[in-house]
Design a protein with these regions (language model features):
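N-terminal Sec-pathway targeting helices
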Residues: 1-13
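Low-complexity intrinsically disordered segments
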Residues: 3-5, 17, 43
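Bacterial N-terminal signal peptides
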Residues: 12-20
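Sec-dependent signal peptide cleavage junction
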Residues: 21-37
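Non-catalytic all-alpha helical scaffold/repeat segments
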Residues: 38-40, 66, 70-296
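Short extracytoplasmic/periplasmic juxtamembrane "stem" segments immediately C-terminal to an N-terminal membrane anchor
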Residues: 40-46
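Ser/Thr/Gly/Pro-rich low-complexity, disordered linker/stalk segments of secreted
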Residues: 47-59
Length: 296
């Protein structure tokens, strides 16, 4: 009995010593965390910017589509995915599309009919928006915000979506279900379409309606996608809009994160303009941002 008590006392002493040592060891500074994050991001950027040979495409075995493939579980019913595509489009009706005189006519035939717009559910309205013929136009501007404002002015689907009180809920659910590999295999423009979905989530009406829970769900979904992209050397996806979505959603919903960002002119510029200049953000600020997301 005395021997057992002695062993227990020794274990307690060792545990106390280990705990004291852990407290005495210097914690990794925010600046060190920031430097490490900057290093990894630079390595990713270098790898991502290097031109890589595209795998040869077998035209006889191309299963990808021009419309948006609906992820399983998004709708609670089976549906014809092509019902959300405009009747006149560059893939199904190329002759009619090519006969259109200018961009004005292209936009006109790409609108959602009024009777559908007034009655369609928000979940399905999102799918109409994902299939907008000219959605890629959002990439033709200096900033993503300017691009999406242009799409808003040109397309009644986005304008209607931004009035729906449950738009954020529908968009977040779709984003969480967006499997990178599956969508890339099924969608001929899957990588660009993901950026478009992320750009919709970054619109002011969506960000301003987010609850803290929704913002955290978005951050978790973004982190999952970023991890998959950066760890796959051959990934065709970019993390740019994904990183931005994670940042602006937290900035809108978290006072703590907003305080970190507002203390850095470079970080604030990134949030407000979508322009990332790494040298404008200090290692300390970057470390605080990384630590914030790690603790979510």
């Amino acid at each position: 009995m005395k021997k057992r008590r002695t062993i227990i006392v020794c274990i307690c002493i060792l545990a106390a010593a280990a705990f004291t040592l852990a407290l005495a060891l210097p914690k990794k500074s925010y600046a060190a965390i920031g430097r490490n994050a900057r290093k990894h991001y630079a390595e990713y950027e270098t790898r991502h910017s290097d031109p890589q040979d595209e795998p040869a495409k077998d035209e006889d075995d191309d299963s990808s589509e021009f419309w948006f493939p609906v992820p399983e579980g998004y709708l609670n019913k089976k549906t014809d995915e092509k019902k959300y595509v405009s009747s006149i489009n560059p893939d199904d009706t190329p002759e009619q599309w090519d006969a259109l005189e200018d961009a004005v006519q292209m936009r006109e035939v790409s609108q959602i009919p009024a009777d559908i717009l007034e009655t369609v559910s928000t979940d399905e309205l999102v799918l109409y928006c994902m299939n907008y013929n000219l959605f890629i136009d959002f990439m033709l501007f200096n900033t993503m915000q300017d691009g999406m404002e242009n799409v808003r002015s040109d397309y009644n689907g986005i304008r209607e979506l931004m009035t729906r009180p449950d738009a954020a809920e529908s968009l977040i659910r779709l984003y969480k279900l967006y499997d990178l590999d599956e969508q890339k295999a099924r969608d001929s423009v899957g990588c660009i379409r993901l950026c478009y979905l992320e750009a919709m989530l970054c619109m002011p009406e969506i960000l301003n309606s987010l609850t803290a829970k929704q913002a955290n769900e978005l951050a978790a979904a973004c982190a999952q996608k970023i991890s998959k992209i950066v760890n796959d050397e051959n990934s065709p996806y970019s993390v740019s809009t994904t990183m931005y979505l994670a940042a602006v959603s937290q900035y809108a919903a978290s006072e703590e994160f907003a305080e970190i960002v507002n203390a850095s002119s470079g970080a604030k510029r990134y949030i407000e303009e979508g322009i990332l200049v790494p040298d404008e953000i200090s290692d300390d600020t970057l470390g605080r941002i990384v630590s914030y997301f790690q603790e979510l």
